[in-house]
From Swiss-Prot:
Leader sequence segment: none
Gene: rplS
Family statement: Belongs to the bacterial ribosomal protein bL19 family.
Entry protein name: Large ribosomal subunit protein bL19
Function according to Swiss-Prot or TrEMBL: This protein is located at the 30S-50S ribosomal subunit interface and may play a role in the structure and function of the aminoacyl-tRNA binding site.
Species assigned in the record: Bartonella tribocorum (strain CIP 105476 / IBS 506)
Keyword Ribosomal protein: yes
InterPro entries named among the record's database cross-references: Ribosomal_bL19, Ribosomal_bL19_CS, Ribosomal_bL19_sf, Translation_prot_SH3-like_sf
Length: 146
């Protein structure tokens, strides 16, 4: 590991200690709390929309959020490790089969909706849990290879 990558990893770890983001993917509806400075006043502004892309890695990782404001599509790119981002809330999970949802730019109205992912939680549980996957055992891999 070169020294630049090592320094970036240390900075990422330091920022992640201060705040935790939920694990979200393209297709998920998120609410991003952004610190906005107007003159001498600062306030926190909520920006809610569909995450249409995640790109980059390390300190340069970004995600793009698209929303419809007064009939116009508005997209905003947020750096994941920006100090201006106060929090990211996961509003709902979306069921998509693509990593980049740029095709939503050409769709209007009901065609631009994304189906909600069903997670079959028990009654009374709140929030979305991260589903853990188990690695495939070696004997199953050999059966598939034969």
């Amino acid at each position: 590991m070169n020294i630049i990558a090592q320094l970036e990893a240390e900075q990422c770890a330091k920022i992640e200690e201060k705040r935790q983001f939920p694990a979200f993917k393209p297709g998920d509806t998120v609410r991003v709390m952004v610190r906005v400075t107007e003159g001498t006043r600062t306030r926190v502004q909520a920006y809610e929309g569909v995450c249409i892309a995640r790109s980059g890695g390390g300190l340069n990782e970004t995600f793009t959020v698209r929303k419809i404001s007064y009939g116009e599509g508005v997209e905003r790119v947020f750096p994941v490790y920006s100090p201006l981002i106060e929090a990211v809330e996961l509003v709902r999970r979306g069921k998509v089969r693509r990593a980049k949802l740029y095709y939503l730019r050409g769709l209007r109205g009901k065609a631009a909706r994304i189906a909600e992912k069903r997670d079959y939680r028990k009654k009374g549980e709140k929030g979305v849990e991260k589903v853990e996957t188990t690695p495939v055992s070696a004997d199953i891999e050999t059966q598939v290879a034969e």
